[in-house]
Amino acid sequence: MTKVFINGEFIDQNEAKVSYEDRGYVFGDGIYEYIRAYDGKLFTVTEHFERFIRSASEIQLDLGYTVEELIDVVRELLKVNNIQNGGIYIQATRGVAPRNHSFPTPEVKPVIMAFAKSYDRPYDDLENGINAATVEDIRWLRCDIKSLNLLGNVLAKEYAVKYNAGEAIQHRGETVTEGASSNVYAIKDGAIYTHPVNNYILNGITRKVIKWISEDEDIPFKEETFTVEFLKNADEVIVSSTSAEVTPVVKIDGEQVGDGKVGPVTRQLQEGFNKYIESRSS
């Protein structure tokens, strides 16, 4: 039987329940993280939980856990479910209290839940690339917080699905921000361009890894804003996330990117990413 973690206990998934008054359910008042496991080891887990705790701090939520304690939780979750390759979803809400927009009283504690599932790497997408569709970014102004409020992302992703695209690339006006569930990069003349870290994007963990690889390989990494037109005229385009890794984009809005094939810089980043899986998994 699959086990899930809820507030300090590992229980059968059939016994896992959420209160109808949980603030995550009625307000989306909470945060989450998603962590990848390769061969039974957690990839960049410290970076993920440092971001998790930062997100909690930004919404004035005291988790009551340290990074090390959270790592212990997800390690045990992998163990009890015998998962070697897959992902761990963990979220924290502001707890259970009568519905009121203001914060509950201090005795109300967060509800922390986590589950793990097995899945393989996205080999086909990594090898052949995906199509993407551009869409106006309608999300709130604190996209740096990994909030449970994902309605804007959901609507963007559904727009992409309707156009047979694997990702929605969002833009505010003409400025590209990020994907519905990824960071976005334009590669031009051997340099990588991506939106700077601020409140308009999530500072992705895979984005950090790509930056590390760029430093290792002496690839220019430019954290600058760029337009939809610049993106469509790039030599290569990639999106990155914990689940997507380093995924090439070969078409945007039905238009071919570059020569329509996965480019050399993308392949270089993918090779570097594989090396980091080995060196940063524990």
Swiss-Prot record:
User: What keywords appear on the UniProt entry?
Assistant: Aminotransferase, Pyridoxal phosphate, Transferase
Residues with PTM N6-(pyridoxal phosphate)lysine: K146
- Quickly give the catalysed reaction: D-alanine + 2-oxoglutarate = D-glutamate + pyruvate
Cofactor(s) demanded: pyridoxal 5'-phosphate
According to its UniProt entry, this protein's organism is Staphylococcus haemolyticus
UniProt-listed Gene3D superfamilies: 3.30.470.10, D-amino Acid Aminotransferase, subunit A, domain 2
Query: Which superkingdom?
Result: Bacteria
Q: Does the keyword Transferase apply?
A: yes
Q: What does this protein do?
A: Acts on the D-isomers of alanine, leucine, aspartate, glutamate, aminobutyrate, norvaline and asparagine. The enzyme transfers an amino group from a substrate D-amino acid to the pyridoxal phosphate cofactor to form pyridoxamine and an alpha-keto acid in the first half-reaction. The second half-reaction is the reverse of the first, transferring the amino group from the pyridoxamine to a second alpha-keto acid to form the product D-amino acid via a ping-pong mechanism. This is an important process in the formation of D-alanine and D-glutamate, which are essential bacterial cell wall components.
Q: Where along this sequence does the record place binding of substrate?
A: Y32, R99, H101
For this protein, the Enzyme Commission number is: 2.6.1.21
Gene symbol of the encoding locus: dat
| Catalytic residues (UniProt) | K146
The protein, known as: D-alanine aminotransferase
The enzyme's first-digit EC class, named in words, is transferase
Per UniProt, subunit arrangement is: Homodimer.
